[in-house]
Amino acid sequence: MKSTLSYLLIICSLFTACIGHQEESLLFYVDTRTGTAPSATHTAELFGKNTEEYGQTLPAVLEPNGMNFWTPQTQDTEAKCKAPYYYKDTKIQGFRNSHWIVGGCTQDYGSMTLMPVSGTLKYLPQDRGSLFSHQEETATPAYYSVLLKDYSIFAEMTGRSRSAIFRFTYNQPEDAYLIVNPNSDEGKGYIEIDTIKKQIRGYNPVHRIYQGWGEPAGYNGYFIIEYQNEIEEYGTFRHDSLFAGQRQIADGTGIGAYLRFKIHSEGPILIKAASSFTDMEGAQKNLDTEIPHWDFDRTRQELNSIWEQRLSQVTVQTNNRNDKEKFYGALYRASFLPRTFNDVDGRYPSFSTGHPFRQSANGRNYYEDYSMWDTYRALHPLVNILTPKKAGDMMQSLVDKYEQGGWLPIFPCWNSYTAAMIGDHCISALGDAYIKGIRNFDINKACEGMLRNAFRTPATYEEYKNGMGRRALNSYLKYGYIPLEDSVPEAFHTCEQVSRTLEYAYDDFVLAQVLQKLETSDDYFPDPQKTGLYDTLMIRARYYRNVINPSTGYAQGRYADGSFLTDAGNAFSFTRFITEGAPCHYTWYAPHDIYGLMECMGGKKKYIAKLDSMFSEHRYWHGNEPCHQIAYLFNYAGQPWKTQREVRHIMETEYLNAPGGLSGNDDAGQMSAWYVFSAMGFYPVCPGTPYYIIGSPSFPRMSIRLENGKTFTILAHNANKKNIYIQSAKLNGKEYDKNYFTHQDIVQGGTLEFQMGPNPNTNWGASALSLPPDNMK
């Protein structure tokens, strides 16, 4: 036993040494465990509580936007707000093919867990968990390994989009077991052992949350596991009952299966696994296509290459390893979602119902799990820059959902409608893609769905209750805002009337921009207000003004008679008419009309004073999305040096290279996408327009490798921790004084060059001609 344990430790040591010889690989700048511990940043301590105190990320092995996230498991539940892995936990219970919506407070679904154990058979997750050390854990995007101390088993995993291969080196080969669970918290599911084909097969039914909580989603998470070795013993179990020699079991709490392998010498055994949302045949085809062999190292190298290509889309030059690790860690986390949902043959379950199965056309993928209230802000704009073809496929998937379900979804997750969060931001994602030149999706059908959401409510109460259509649209259209009397009872989170008004106004603006670019005729869709569609939507784009209290300059609850709440002090307190924040956070949410917002606040001077106070009085909360554009809003007032200062401060204090290094939920990659953009020196304050607002580039040189073969390079001479202020700029060799630039500047390739210094240059980017355009003119 001692000799075998020494052998395992040597394996760990050799792999660690290998890392040292591959420093040039970008994968080794990524520690996938960042965000798995309680947030330790400044604003997390001020505002974070309950589920917001974690980044809710995973140390997952995956392909970018792949189907499965292969992760160690320390939590044995698919429950809402419980990630499969937390850094603080001391025992690993297995390795899961997770479909967790990474970085959020949602649920896992359709998952399966397998665990190698040795010695006495322990099959329940809470019993079989093994102590482990983070010092004996290796976590990269393409490979994970850990020493399971209780069993002296060295466990390794790598994989592809829908499949994985495991290498387990057992210390006690005469008592080498494999445990498999379909992870149903609902007590449903099925598992069977096929000793002829050397397979374990099963499924875990998917259930909805939010609208239709607990209802079947109409499809299952199927899985297949293959092994090579002969077995000496097998059986099934249900909670605390063991059924030796039984080949199958269905339904019940804690069901699973086990094998005892017939191996009598030291050395690794290999296990392969794959999944599908269609059927068992789909899982088999996924495995046979993606990993048709038993070569662990080959699969690992394939996944290494995929990640190397992904991460090298943006190359940075710096002597600061810490910042380089933060950047590539953020790019990794911005590569999880939306997930591939179809099998290798293109089949996937119908949106909303599960049946019949659909077929993706022309070799494209169908995507699912859009945490759209979060990701329209920066993650989807980042995809539009780095992988526009994939972006178009993601947008076509939204169109497919509209065609299959009858309504454009609000927050599509689990291949189902939900009204979990507010707004109608599939409109923003679709509009941003189209405005930025992405054409490989059906914009006409998309427009049909967007207009339906903007002007109609479901014909039946059942549809509305099921999550279709905008919440409280009738009130919004009647009053020009959602009054406090409308409690929005059929939303998962009721009330939030002011935030809904603000976000609908923005979505209406984006839809207007799409119609204008399409030059859509007014008979494209019946307009109940009898004016041009574009004009109607642009009027509605100003509805945000209806919830800005002119006496305070802050967003505030308003009654149907037009009166505002009288308590001015509540601008700084969390309240039910605001989504996950206070009025002082949401007041800044008019990304499409910052100059109009400035007017609502009483002019530029008061606007600047309020903006200053957000930071000087510690009201800014980076841990939640409504604040993400705020630091960039100084540019609109001609004070871009303040944007440069605050953005750099956020990057330094709200992003750490540590397990607790995120300031709140990563929310499907939005938090990380903010960092990627900000490190590059710009941010999409208003998706649906072609403009990027300039911040403070943090690396001396960055190059964005574009799909069209061109390169956009950002040079920041003298950039470091002290030299955070822009002194001057050039675009393609010409002096540049604007504090923004366009998407076209990126896609045509070129060089944006900055001279950086330790003191603000209050003249650069400050003149009236330097400010971002007024979108409302």
Task: Give residue spans per PLM region.
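Accessory carbohydrate-recognition regions in carbohydrate-active enzymes
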Residues: 22-380, 384-428, 434-502, 510-520, ...
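Bacterial Sec-dependent N-terminal signal peptides
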Residues: 1-23
